[in-house]
């Protein structure tokens, strides 16, 4: 058998134009994103985070601005109403047998002594002789004295060296608050009745009126 002829037939059987199919190879660099893409992505994420934090900060700030006037208003209301820091309303209360009036507590003595002794007696009660601050308070005191025939020392005496009436706190009597009937001489003290205010000797025996400031309980 002629081997050259067989080999030639085999070669003749194959199509001379046939070639094996091949796929183009992809470069490894083609699958990689450019470096600036990564940089842009990082910058974008950082920007979004920064914007989010800014929005949160603005939200908190705006809420604070909105609530601040309300907080201040509540704080002022708490001070005016005498509320305690715990939020419970503080009660203003006078001791037993004391008469409340605005921010004061008043009490009338049951005994008669000179003005100086009345001053000491009030001090022992952590109080002072009555200081009348305005016409409204004068009317209130005279109203609670209705039906009483006695006169009552108050914290007002005549200072001869200054030739004027002064309260025990050092303030000068204002004539528009009350007028005193009687002499203006040394050792003169003021006494109040349910109708008038009189001048009498500080050494005379009379009742008196004490006052103290209302306390929180």
UniProtKB/Swiss-Prot annotation:
Membrane-spanning residues: 46-66
GO BP of this protein: regulation of natural killer cell mediated cytotoxicity
Location in the cell: Membrane
Domain C-type lectin: 101-211
Keywords: Disulfide bond, Lectin, Membrane, Signal-anchor, Transmembrane, Transmembrane helix
PROSITE patterns membership: C_TYPE_LECTIN_2
UniProt tissue specificity: Expressed in natural killer cells and a subset of T-cells.
GO cellular component: cell surface; plasma membrane
SMART domains documented for this protein: CLECT
Extracellular side: 67-217
CDD domains: CLECT_NK_receptors_like (cd03593)
Location (main, coarse): membrane
InterPro entries on file: C-type_lectin-like (IPR001304), C-type_lectin-like/link_sf (IPR016186), CTDL_fold (IPR016187), KLR_subfamily_B (IPR051527), NKR-like_CTLD (IPR033992)
Cytoplasmic topological domain residue ranges: 1-45
Membrane topology per record: Single-pass type II membrane protein
Span of the annotated motif LCK-binding motif: 31-34
Disulfide bonds listed in the record: 122-210, 189-202
Any one GO molecular-function label of the UniProt entry: signaling receptor activity
Functional summary from the UniProt entry: Binds CLEC2I/Clr-g leading to activation of natural killer cells or stimulation of IL-2 production and proliferation of T-cells in response to antigen stimulation. May contribute to the formation of the immunological synapse between T-cells and antigen-presenting dendritic cells.
Name of the protein in question: Killer cell lectin-like receptor subfamily B member 1F
Originating gene: Klrb1f
């Amino acid at each position: 058998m002629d081997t050259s002829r067989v080999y030639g037939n085999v070669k003749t059987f194959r199509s001379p134009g046939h070639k094996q199919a091949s796929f183009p190879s992809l470069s490894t660099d083609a699958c990689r994103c450019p470096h600036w893409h990564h940089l842009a992505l990082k910058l974008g994420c950082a920007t979004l985070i920064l914007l989010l934090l800014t929005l949160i900060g603005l939200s908190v700030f705006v809420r604070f601005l909105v609530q601040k006037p309300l907080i201040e208003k509540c704080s002022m209301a708490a001070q005016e109403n005498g509320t305690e820091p715990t939020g419970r309303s503080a009660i203003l209360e006078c001791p037993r047998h004391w008469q409340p009036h605005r921010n004061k507590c008043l009490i009338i003595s049951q005994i008669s002594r000179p003005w100086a002794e009345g001053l000491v007696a009030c001090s022992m009660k952590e109080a002072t002789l009555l200081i009348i601050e305005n016409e409204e308070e004068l009317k209130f005191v005279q109203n609670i004295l209705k039906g009483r025939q006695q006169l009552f020392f108050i914290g007002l005496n005549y200072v001869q060296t200054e030739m004027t009436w002064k309260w025990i706190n050092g303030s000068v009597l204002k004539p528009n608050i009350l007028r005193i009937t009687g002499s203006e001489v040394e050792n003169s003290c003021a006494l109040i009745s349910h109708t008038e205010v009189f001048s009498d000797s500080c050494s005379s025996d009379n009742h008196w009126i004490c006052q103290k400031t209302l306390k929180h309980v």
